[in-house]
Curated annotation (Swiss-Prot):
Has the structural arrangement of an alpha-helix connected to antiparallel beta-sheets by disulfide bonds (CS-alpha/beta). Transmembrane segments: none annotated. This is Toxin Cll9. It comes from Centruroides limpidus. GO terms for molecular function: sodium channel inhibitor activity; toxin activity.
Length: 84
């Protein structure tokens, strides 16, 4: 039983460590996903969850996501924004 708890705890920790936070980035257009501060939170949350993140919100007119998989393209700064 203790082994099962330890394995579960390790898997949760690994998932947390490998998760990334950042602005959703469109590699093709080379820009971050635009939003309207405060009113764009629902769209950002939906787009972040679609990309595998835990949640998202609008920050500096771009969609900031928490808990994205490492394979999802992100930017650490809002930079140039574009519509999806």
């Amino acid at each position: 039983m203790n082994s099962l708890l330890m394995i579960t705890a390790c898997l949760i920790l690994i998932g947390t460590v490998w998760a990334e936070d950042g602005y959703l980035f469109d590699k093709r257009k080379r820009c971050t996903l635009a939003c309207i501060d405060k009113t764009g939170d629902k769209n950002c949350d939906r787009n972040c969850k679609k990309e595998g993140g835990s949640f998202g919100h609008c920050s500096y007119s771009a969609c900031w996501c928490k808990g994205l998989p490492g394979s999802t393209p992100i930017s650490r700064t809002p930079g140039k924004t574009c519509k999806k």
